[in-house]
Amino acid sequence: VLEQIHRWQRKMYKEHGIHFIHASDEWYILAGLELPEEERYDGYLQLENGVGMLRLLDTEVRLAVEKRTGDEKPRSITVATGKLAAPYIEKCLEKISTKYPNLEYEVITIRNNFFGEKITVSGLITGTDLKEQLSNRKLGERVLIPCNMLRSGENVFLDDLTVDDVSKAIGREIVIVEEDGEDLVSSVLDPVQNKKQTRRQMYEQTSSSNSGQA
C-alpha cells in the first residue's frame, strides 16, 4: 500500500507540484519504515489526520535544541507514553542529550490494561495504568506525560483519576507536555514554573482504533 502511495505521490508532484496523497504516521510505524522526509508532507496540511505529526515533532525538537547553548547540569526525567510513540520520543531525547550530556532519561512504554493491550496510543492511557505501572519503580525527578492523555481542558484522565492522584501515588511531580517539540524540550530541561505553555491539538490524536495514531 505504501509503495502505491509513493508512486502516486511522484506522479502528482511531477504533474501538479504537490504530493497530495499521504499515509498517516501509523502506517510507517507498523511497516517498520522510516517516516518520509519533511518536504513530502506539503507543509503539513493533514496533521489532524495523523499525517506528519512525528516528523514535525522531530523537526521542532531539533530546532528548539539548536537555539539553546547547552550545559552540563545534571537532570533526570522519565517519560511515560504509548507503545507507538515511545521509539520516537526516545530519538527526541537523544537529540536533546547531545547538548545536555548529563541528562539522564528513560522512556517507559505504558501497557493499556484498561482498554486492552492492542490499544497502543498514548491518548487512551488511563491514570490507573500509569499509577500501577510507575509505582514502586525507579523514576526521574519528574515524570512527563503527553497532554492527550487528559480530557480536553482538564487535568483528568479518562478513568476520572486526576493528575494529582497519580502524582501522589508515584511520588513524583507530573509535567504535562503540550503537542509541540519546543514544549517537549522545555519540559525536559527547564524548571516547571519557567516551562513554555502552548496548546495545539495535533500530536498523538486520541483514537479508538485497535492501533491508533502515534
Model regions and ranges:
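Auxiliary Fe-S-binding modules of radical SAM enzymes
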Residues: V1-A214
